[in-house]
Amino acid sequence: MVARWLRTPEVVRWWGDPEEQEALVTQDLDEPLMRQWIVEHERRPFAYAQAYPAHAWPQPHLAQLPEGSAVIDAFIGEPAMLGQGHGRGFLRRLAKMLLAEGAPVVAIDPALDNHRARRAYAHAGFVGEMVVETEHGPAVLMLFQ
């Protein structure tokens, strides 16, 4: 299912090479610091999310985050579910859960030109417009507190 999602045009556009991403997601199943979820709506899987400690894999644009901060990466894999508001709903719940577990802040870093994701994250409660450079190009650092 995740392999199929990684091949949808919208996911490929932002996540890149499906084979590479599938290998990384599979490899991360054995990584205790990487938490992964399949997100469902009415018992139908539609999205993938992962969360990890911000400083576990050092990235310069996350270096200033407080110790214990969490980072989320996510995508909607079912094209029919895009634009329905489900992304913002599960991201808000996930961010609140990570805060309740002790993270002082939860970060997400959509590509600068991924306007759909940026709107969804803002509706979920993430704030921030700081443009940062990442290994994948310019992104916007958004925080949930």
Predicted segments with their positions:
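Acetyl-CoA-dependent GNAT
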Residues: A23-M81, M97
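A structural microfeature
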Residues: A47, M130-E133
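Structural motif
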Residues: E67-S69, V105, A139
